[in-house]
Amino acid sequence: MLAKRIVPCLDVRDGQVVKGVQFRNHEIIGDIVPLAKRYAEEGADELVFYDITASSDGRVVDKSWVARVAEVIDIPFCVAGGIKSVEDASRILQFGADKVSINSPALANPALITELADKFGVQCIVVGIDSYFDAETGKYQVYQFTGDESRTKATQWETRDWVLEVQKRGAGEIVLNMMNQDGVRNGYDLKQLNMVREVCHVPLIASGGAGEMVHFADAYQKANVDGALAASVFHKQIINIGELKQYLKEQNVEIRL
């Protein structure tokens, strides 16, 4: 059985790590490289970096910090932000990233998923999905441009259908960003994760809602996700990654210590 992954997420804006609540009101957390180094030393299995305004600003992630991160950590890391072409992805991978993640650009041009998978292999291609539960309709809807409050908008895709579509096109992994839970620390949306897990046959990473160690255990054991991504609990040192891994091992979760 493959070990479950713990994945700190660093949202990047203007060269600094920031964190919002439900994708709004971002506060500055600190500099990218020292945080990345700290998480790697604490025992993170992987890191994810989102340049959160790259897509809405119509630019590609700033590559200068990608190279600096690659120099100081020895764990895999994934980079997202405005990657719209094979050339964009190639440059980020050349700078040292192990994977690229696409979100809004995949919604604008679904064929991009296939192009990237064909060129770099599916293991390099992650699709991020920003999913919002609309209480009025009772549906999970995919959103676009969520890094910019003024431009974020619903798409025509329901989450389950988009999960099926991106797999068909070559996604090697899916990160499900559950917008209603983001930064609230009340736990991952297990109902939504189970709905997606039923139709997701590639590694699935839960994102949005981690507040306590038990939330990680629940995601692994009750929704069978492959990894759990979190930001604020790590940034604010509410949870230490080494201690979290020890706790998960005691809960009989397969984890790398």
Curated annotation (Swiss-Prot):
EC number(s) from the headed UniProt entry: 4.3.2.10
Top-level taxon: Bacteria
GO cellular component: cytoplasm
Enzyme class: lyase
Compartment annotation: Cytoplasm
Catalytic activity: 5-[(5-phospho-1-deoxy-D-ribulos-1-ylimino)methylamino]-1-(5-phospho-beta-D-ribosyl)imidazole-4-carboxamide + L-glutamine = D-erythro-1-(imidazol-4-yl)glycerol 3-phosphate + 5-amino-1-(5-phospho-beta-D-ribosyl)imidazole-4-carboxamide + L-glutamate + H(+)
Main location: cytoplasm
Pathways per UniProt: Amino-acid biosynthesis; L-histidine biosynthesis; L-histidine from 5-phospho-alpha-D-ribose 1-diphosphate: step 5/9
Claim: Secreted is one of the keywords in the record: no
Residue numbers annotated as active site: 11, 130
A GO BP entry: L-histidine biosynthetic process
Pfam families the UniProt entry points to: His_biosynth
InterPro entries named among the record's database cross-references: Aldolase_TIM (IPR013785), His_biosynth (IPR006062), HisF (IPR004651), IGPS_HisA/HisF (IPR050064), RibuloseP-bd_barrel (IPR011060)
Family of the protein in this entry: Belongs to the HisA/HisF family.
Functional description taken from the UniProt entry: IGPS catalyzes the conversion of PRFAR and glutamine to IGP, AICAR and glutamate. The HisF subunit catalyzes the cyclization activity that produces IGP and AICAR from PRFAR using the ammonia provided by the HisH subunit.
Subunit structure as annotated in this protein's UniProt entry: Heterodimer of HisH and HisF.
The protein, known as: Imidazole glycerol phosphate synthase subunit HisF
Organism classification: Bacteria, Pseudomonadati, Pseudomonadota, Gammaproteobacteria, Vibrionales
Gene from which the chain derives: hisF
